[in-house]
Amino acid sequence: FFFSSRRRHTRYWRDWSSDVCSSDLELPTGKMKSREGTVVDADDLIDEMVSIAATHTQELGKVKDFAETELKELYSTIGIGALKFFLLRVDPKKKMIFNPEESIDFHGFTGPFIQYTHARIKSVLRKNEINVGSKIMNEPLHKMEKELLVHCELFEQTLFQAGQSHDPSTLSMYLFQLAQMFNSFYAALSISNAESEEKKQLRLKISSLVATILKSGMQLLGINVPEKM
C-alpha cells in the first residue's frame, strides 16, 4: 500500500518547506540572524555536521569494510541527514534550537537513528533469503509482530495528515516510533534463528516492510538512508 500512497500524497508536500523555513532557528549560542551578528554560513554548518558524523561513526566502530570513497559518502549522508531531520522533526510553528552534537545521536530522536535502523534491517535481509512464495501462517502473531504491522498500516494516514497540515514533524515522529518499535522487536525476537522456518519468513517479510517504509518516509523528507552502516 505504501508505494501507491506515497504517489497519491506527494502533492501535499509541495509547499511545506516554506512553512519550515519560516520558523525561528537558534543555535545554542543564539539566533541564526545576521542583524544579531550570529549568522551561520550554511556550507560551514554542513561541513561541521559531516565532520561530527565521521567522528561519531568511527567511535562506534561502524566503518569496517568500507572503501575510502564509500566512507566519505556515508559521512555526508549521515551528517546532512541529521541536519535535515533535526529541522523537520520540530513543529514549524515552534522555535527550534539546533544542537549539532545532539542531532547525530545514534540512539535518540534523530535521522542517524532511523538511518542505522534501516541499515540494520538491510544487513539482516542480505544474510537471509525471503521466500516470496511462502504461505501466511495460521498461528497467532506475537504481540510485537502485530504491533509492528499495525504501525506500518498507519503510514498512509500519517502521510495524509502531515501533508494536509504542512507539518513534516508528524512524519518524522512516525518514522522514529517505527524505528524504535523495530529495534525492540529485533532485540526480543530472533529472526535468523526463529523457532520455525515459517516464523523466520514472517519476520523477514515484516522487516522488509519496515525498511521500505523507513526509506520511503525519509526520502519524502529529503533524506537518504544507507544500505549499510
Question: Where are the predicted features?
Answer:
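Single conserved hydrophobic/aromatic residue that forms the stacking wall/gate
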Residues: 1-21
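Non-catalytic interaction-recognition regions
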Residues: 18-229
